[in-house]
A protein has these predicted regions:
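Protruding loop/beta-arch "assembly-hinge" segments enriched in small, turn-prone residues
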Residues: 3, 7-10, 26-27, 225-263
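Extended oligomerization regions of viral-like shell subunits
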Residues: 12, 103-235, 239-241, 263
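Short, charged, low-complexity patches
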Residues: 69-77, 81
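Short, glycine/acidic-rich hinge or "gate" loops at secondary-structure transitions
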Residues: 90-105
């Protein structure tokens, strides 16, 4: 849930076209005689959020419910919440935009792509191509990659001067944090991004982005519903929320793809 916690969250009416400027405002210098132009400026780009339902449902027999009601109730909500957050995080990157949020990898507005050969992937010079693509205004972003990609390919990498650029930091509480080329790294599971070893040619193996440039819109916060299905002697529980998500600003997002060995 670390990625879901970092993306921007709003609550606006679905179906309404929202100018990007409203989601990513800019400040302007003014004088006593001249007010800011934003009063008459119009944004060329906009996003529209839809109504997509996400639910996690489970049932148990009435007999089992009598025996384990409190235990089941205590477990269901956190388990359902975890499952729904995981589904949203997968959609943030791989969502098709049809019946679910539009993911970063599927958004045609994300055009910055760097392809690394195996030799480049394993070297500072190769990843320096990615750093050179980072725009100044967006350099406070983070890398997103598979845990295996970081552990086997990035951790311990050195620059041309022998200085480590990929490393694992261990906090006083034992929690691991990852850094690469001066940027934070968020590691994900295989269902979000494949590892370098498992990826096919042309697959995205890493993303550089500022998480606040992706917006999650909820029209109905997570609700828990419980009812009895007397025909089947089942007690049913479900968590339900209405959510959509889209990239608000694609200018700072970079996709890193797997290439083939240069000949």
């Amino acid at each position: 849930g670390s990625i879901y916690a970092k993306v921007r969250k709003i609550n606006v009416q679905g179906g309404v076209s929202i100018p990007i400027a409203d989601l990513k405002p800019t400040a302007h210098w003014i004088t006593e005689a001249k007010s800011s132009d934003d009063q008459k400026a119009s944004a060329k780009n906009s996003v529209t959020f839809n109504y997509y339902g996400l639910e996690c449902k489970i049932s148990q027999s009435i007999l089992a419910n009598v025996v384990t009601l409190k235990m089941f109730t205590d477990l269901f909500v956190p388990m359902a919440t975890e499952a729904m957050v995981k589904a949203i995080e997968i959609a943030i990157f791989n969502g098709t935009g049809e019946g679910q949020p539009l993911g970063v990898l599927k958004d045609s507005r994300v055009t910055a792509v760097i392809t690394l050969t195996p030799e480049e992937y394993a070297s500072w010079n190769g990843w320096h191509k990615v750093k050179g693509k980072m725009k100044k205004a967006y350099r406070n972003g983070s890398f997103v990659m598979n845990q295996s990609t970081f552990d086997t390919g990035i951790d311990g990498m050195e620059d041309k001067n022998g200085q480590p650029i990929g490393r694992t930091n261990y906090g006083v509480n034992g929690e691991e944090t990852y850094r690469f080329m001066g940027k934070n790294v968020e590691t994900v599971e295989d269902d979000v991004l494949p590892s370098w070893d498992d990826a096919n040619e042309g697959d995205v193996i890493a993303v550089f982005m500022n998480f606040s440039d992706y917006v999650i819109n909820t029209n109905m916060e997570m609700q828990v519903v419980k009812w009895t299905d007397h025909d089947n002697n089942k007690i049913k529980n479900k968590c339900l929320m209405v959510v959509d998500g889209k990239v608000a600003d694609a200018a700072g997002i970079i996709l890193v793809k797997k290439g083939v060995t240069a000949v």
